[in-house]
Amino acid sequence: MEKLTLTPISRVEGEINLPGSKSLSNRALLLAALATGTTQVTNLLDSDDIRHMLNALKALGVKYELSDDKTVCVVEGIGGAFKVQNGLSLFLGNAGTAMRPLAAALCLKGAETAQIILTGEPRMKERPIKHLVDALRQVGAEVQYLENEGYPPLAISNSGLQGGKVQIDGSISSQFLTALLMSAPLAESDMEIEIIGDLVSKPYIDITLSMMNDFGITVENRDYKTFLVKGKQGYVAPQGNYLVEGDASSASYFLASGAIKGKVKVTGIGKKSIQGDRLFADVLEKMGAKITWGEDFIQAEQSPLKGVDMDMNHIPDAAMTIATTALFAEGETVIRNIYNWRVKETDRLTAMATELRKVGAEVEEGEDFIRIQPLALENFQHAEIETYNDHRMAMCFSLIALSNTEVTILDPNCTAKTFPTYFRELEKLSVR
């Protein structure tokens, strides 16, 4: 297995322009495909998950032109449901941001009835999709599980979504609700979506609603408990370029490195960003970092850090970065209400606890929380960090190099899921 050893970094300094957001890129591509008109998507992320979405759209008959650097995509919208070839099988890797929304969109009524299969990597077959399928079936969708009940692969018929009242469990992933919301305007009649349990990751729903609005669809949001969507509508391509914001989750590693040991400015997101993970900077500020907000940048500067005890359900991806940042703070850090870490690219709670212990940390792993004790710079131990084919594990643990000890990252190329050039960018900012 390939490995990368990072030698100790004495300080980080500089500016980085963020690649496009994964969540926004795949939503933009799907909305552009369903819309009437042509959309020019700019600052698209070039990564595995986006490639899976693009390959799926091509197989579904969507025409697009991708620039040489793969960051600009001109999509010709099909103005409604996909024209599905019967028996087509789409392989979506481990891209949840492609699997969930496509599963809903492929239920929409096509001109000719057809069945399609959605599948992916072995890990995708372990990632739950039952809450979405249960909701889709309530509004008339025909979806079957091909292997294990509640998990992909799925066989989906494009027989239509009827609309009406539907209940969806919001406690595991907001992507299920996002998938249903994005397809609801193309249903046969109005849809009233009621959330069962507490909705996790609400800021990701804000992203979905904001982007649907950009493509001409308004949703009535009643305090995240009920959503009303008119049926028999159509998306309309927005005028001019459709800019994908920089990835706020990817910003977290650079902002944390600045807060621990230097000064880093990230551009491509700012105070007007629609991404919830921009609030990661507020957590760093609570820990003691100096944070500066601009219209299109956030800057983090080193200052003594102290541990925090916080509910981070609203920023689950960026919260992982707090787990490694906590090692450099004074006092313990507790990250709470993060059960959904367990259903991501890997079981991130167990993975994080296991790898933190390897570098010498004292960690308590609860069912939905993690408690981390800090380490003195000289007490970090050199370790080979297992990344579990999870891009965020690789990027989080790169921060260990800000101690007095080197760190070895196994399978560093797993960052290709969202940020193929991550280690190159980190190197540019590093002073040894």
Swiss-Prot record:
* UniProt binding sites for phosphoenolpyruvate: K22, G96, R127, Q175, R348, R392, K417
Known catalysed reaction(s)?
3-phosphoshikimate + phosphoenolpyruvate = 5-O-(1-carboxyvinyl)-3-phosphoshikimate + phosphate
Keywords, A to Z, come to: Amino-acid biosynthesis, Aromatic amino acid biosynthesis, Cytoplasm, Transferase
Name the top EC class.
Answer: transferase
The active site of this protein is located at: D317
Q: Which GO terms describe its molecular function?
A: 3-phosphoshikimate 1-carboxyvinyltransferase activity
Query: Which cysteines does the record link by disulfide bonds?
Result: none
Chain residues that bind 3-phosphoshikimate: K22, S23, R27, S173, S174, Q175, S201, D317, N340, K344
Q: A cellular component term (GO) from this record?
A: cytoplasm
**What does this chain do?**
Catalyzes the transfer of the enolpyruvyl moiety of phosphoenolpyruvate (PEP) to the 5-hydroxyl of shikimate-3-phosphate (S3P) to produce enolpyruvyl shikimate-3-phosphate and inorganic phosphate.
| Protein name, per record | 3-phosphoshikimate 1-carboxyvinyltransferase
